Amino acid sequence: MPPNPTPPRRATTTTTRATSGVRRGEEEQGGMAVSASAGEEEEAFEEVDPTGRFGRYADVLGLGSVKKVYRGFDQEEGIEVAWNRVRLRALADRDPAMVERLHAEVRLLRSLHHEHIIGFHKVWLDRDAGVLNFITEVCTSGSLREYRDRHRHVSVKALKKWARQILLGLDHLHTHDPCIIHRDLNCSNVFINGNTGQVKIGDLGLAAIVDKTHVAHTILGTPEFMAPELYTETYTESVDIYSYGMCVLEMVTREMPYAECDSVVQIYHSVTRGVPPAALKRIRDPELRAFIERCIGQPRNRPSAAELLRDPFFAGIDDDDSTGTLG
């Protein structure tokens, strides 16, 4: 459940502005901030981090199951960031295990450096408020699901570029030492910068770090995107390939997999019996359909992310010629 939409908490210190420590109309010599010109309104921060580098604005970028994400600003680099804020006390009362999963996400983000995985900047704990804060890279256009809903007419070429970038991020996770299984890959956990088309994987709160056997045992995820073996509690990183196939299906159709099901129970029965989503039958492009079917096949037949990157499906995606449009 997302947190209650209560007004954002003010910092215990005085509200700070982007030009903190600099008088209006003056420039800090050798500093990191420049004031707005006289007569311009400055946007106030709701709070700043302990170092004074990062500021949080009031507007919310997104609500997750365990956190609220605000628009933030890095005064040192002059870039916008995502300020992730989690109320640990309320979270611990509702689900103590979630606290550890959140800490796991932070630890993972700190160890991962890849152009197609959301970047991490800083983390700190506000003990008085019982809030964990962490600063991450922000993607200007939100999740891939939101972006696809806003832009209904997208070329197959563009879709392939997005799909390939997701695979590059997955390959980095799966070849990480130790291997990392995302376990909750879906289009709401993939983010995009619309002005560049760059795609990044985020929300690693349910990810699992596994040993050399590459086997995990916990049932977690989003039902519409969960591989059947996830329900058996014994699985490998190939569950991410299944979820990836469902992501591609959603990108193509703009429809959640198994939208025809009325409940999680119905989804479970369809998935475990090998019944594909109804949306798959509506894909007319045989190449697209075959690619998705390859991803959501039996675990032993699913290719790795590295193998999929070599699939003919991605041949020529950097060519200038468009290859058709999805409406």
UniProtKB/Swiss-Prot annotation:
GO molecular function: ATP binding; protein serine kinase activity; protein serine/threonine kinase activity
Segments traversing the membrane: none
SUPFAM superfamilies assigned to the protein according to its UniProt record, in alphabetical order: Protein kinase-like (PK-like)
Pfam families in alphabetical order: Pkinase
Keywords tagged on the record: ATP-binding, Kinase, Nucleotide-binding, Serine/threonine-protein kinase, Transferase
Any GO CC annotation of this UniProt entry: cytoplasm
Ranges annotated as biased composition (Low complexity): 9-19
Domain of life of the source: Eukaryota
Compositionally biased spans, kind Acidic residues: 39-48
Nucleotide-binding found in the keyword field: yes
GO biological process: intracellular signal transduction
Active site, renumbered: 203 (proton acceptor)
Record's catalysed reaction(s): L-seryl-[protein] + ATP = O-phospho-L-seryl-[protein] + ADP + H(+); L-threonyl-[protein] + ATP = O-phospho-L-threonyl-[protein] + ADP + H(+)
Residues given in the record as ATP binding sites: 136-139
Similarity field: Belongs to the protein kinase superfamily. Ser/Thr protein kinase family. WNK subfamily.
Record-given protein name: Probable serine/threonine-protein kinase WNK5
